[in-house]
Amino acid sequence: MEQSKELDGGTLKLIAAALMLIDHVGAILLPETVILRCIGRLAFPIFAFFIAEGYAHTRSFGRYLLRMAIWAAVSEIPFNLEFGHFFVPGRQNVLWTFCLALLTLRGLDRLRRVPGNIGYAGAALALAAGFAAGELLHVDYGGWGVMTVALFYLCREGRYARCGLLLGMLVLNGLCISSRTVPAFGIAVPIQILAAAALPVIWLYNGRPGVNRRWRWAFYAFYPAHLLVLEGIQALT
């Protein structure tokens, strides 16, 4: 990804966390306030971008995946409580989406090393398997969430990477990922298409982490913690 000198990783993650908080305030406390959900559409692409970047730069894929899986398990009950139950088999939190995305990227990298058409077929198979797993396991954003991370990974470099990323985001979020709609220009427009508006923010990333490695635990912990706080407020009102 081309560097600029605007936002480091810590700042960009704080922006994503704030956007996620706004989104979940809308989802849990103020479901009729559509503008909050519109603003929140920008959060997932930023986190998906960092999963792709994290995979590309991690020194230990196993530890990265294990860390993600542990926090996914910790976050499952707080996520389920949004739907009023401790166990909701038809919905899994977004950290499981990212676990599947990491496995998909691993398979993609391994299989596309094979020379010739077999390598291309293997890469396509890895993507198809990741998509199918996302759909079958009912993770947040489904298979298209897994594909979003893959899109960021595949469009990290290259002359036309940003054009491909923009086109891919418009297709994924405008046509593939389901969301509520709002009337605009006489038609029903899915609010999910606003996720593409996260790209200019992401393109300000300067490639520097910006925070101590120990702070990464705070970003993981924020996800289940803020859900519990919002659900507690909902229970008291």
What are these regions (language model features)?
Residues 1-237:
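Alpha-helical transmembrane segments and their immediate juxtamembrane cytosolic regions
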